[in-house]
A protein has these predicted regions:
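Glycine-rich, basic loop-to-helix element that forms the pyrophosphate-binding segment
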Residues: 71-90
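Conserved nucleotide-sugar donor-binding catalytic segment
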Residues: 147-231
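A conserved acidic beta->alpha catalytic loop
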Residues: 44-54, 73, 101
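N-proximal low-complexity "stem/linker" segments adjacent to membrane-targeting elements
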Residues: 1-30
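Acidic helix N-cap motif at the loop->helix transition within catalytic regions
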Residues: 23, 48-59, 105, 109
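Conserved donor NDP-sugar-binding/catalytic core segment of glycosyltransferases
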Residues: 109-141
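Short beta-strand-to-loop acidic/aromatic patch adjacent to the donor-nucleotide binding site
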Residues: 93-105
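Short, acidic, metal-binding catalytic loop of nucleotide-sugar glycosyltransferases
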Residues: 29-39
Length: 274
């Protein structure tokens, strides 16, 4: 890894990978930004075939600053991301942290829009975007749109995590003062993390489709759906700032637990099919 230069980078892309090298390469190749103005921190979460630095760089810009942290065993996304945040502690050579998941694709303007927005809105600490969910094996896709203003975001957080994890970017300085991704909310660690961040700052959603997120039947959100819903209930109970919205949110989540995941996904596709 090249030696860091003070204030050299606009952002760090934080991404973890477990046995998905091809998806990782596709995701990193989709980033359209000056490669000397950002760096990638990759956490290899104990992949059976270790991710080799030289192999990855063969598929990426030679100017890209890529650092790989290899975990000795598969520890799950929460601990993998926290290992990345721990590595970043104390560094002052970048301004923002952006998330990306293996298999997901960035639009050409994603990072230009998010960096520009945060630069132009110093009161905002966390920014996400609309996105498209797509099953690449069938071509089926549906859109995900949500309110864009902080007040509406705070209201809707009682009902769901409005931030799709790989769409977000946040200020590194703010995150450095917060706890890491919580391990007390299995498979909803991002919900807890963003809700905690919202206790200390403001957020916005950009009304543009800046990501295509892969739908996979083996993805964590589907394979651990009930545990995720239980964790989401715990998040709402801990962070709600409205008793009414909190109760409505918990009832909604409990009803979702009764609905098979296949039905829930089918309903989403029918409502938002494109």
């Amino acid at each position: 890894m090249k030696e860091p230069i003070a204030e050299a980078y606009d952002f760090c892309v934080l991404i973890s990978c477990y046995n998905n090298r091809d998806g990782l390469v596709r995701s990193l190749q989709s980033i359209c930004y000056d490669p000397v103005k950002y760096f990638v921190l990759l956490i290899d979460d104990g992949s059976i075939e270790p991710l080799i630095f030289s192999d990855l760089t063969n598929h990426l810009s030679p100017l890209l600053n890529l650092h790989v942290i290899r975990l000795p065993r598969n520890s799950g996304i929460t601990r993998a991301l926290n290992a990345g945040l721990h590595y970043l502690e104390g560094r002052t050579d970048f301004r923002f942290i952006a998330r990306l998941d293996c298999g997901d694709l960035c639009s050409e303007d994603r990072f230009h829009r998010q960096v520009g927005f945060l630069d132009g809105h110093p009161d905002i600490d966390l920014v996400g975007s609309w996105c498209v969910f797509k099953d690449f094996s069938t071509g089926e896709a549906y859109t995900y749109t949500i309110p864009t203003q902080h007040k509406q975001i705070m209201r809707d957080m009682h009902f769901k995590n409005v931030f799709i994890h790989p769409t977000v970017m946040w200020r590194a300085g703010v995150a450095a003062r917060l706890p890491a991704y919580p391990e007390t909310f299995p498979h909803a660690e991002d919900y807890g993390f963003f809700y905690e961040l919202l206790q200390h700052g403001k957020a916005a959603i950009l009304p543009y489709y800046l990501m295509v997120c892969e739908i996979s039947p083996t993805g964590l959100s589907l394979s651990h759906r009930k545990q995720q819903l239980r964790s989401r209930i715990k998040v709402v109970r801990q962070y709600r700032d409205s008793l009414l919205y909190g109760v409505i949110g918990e009832i909604r989540l409990r009803l979702l637990m009764l609905l098979p995941s296949e039905w829930a996904l089918k309903i989403k596709k029918q409502l938002r099919n494109i």
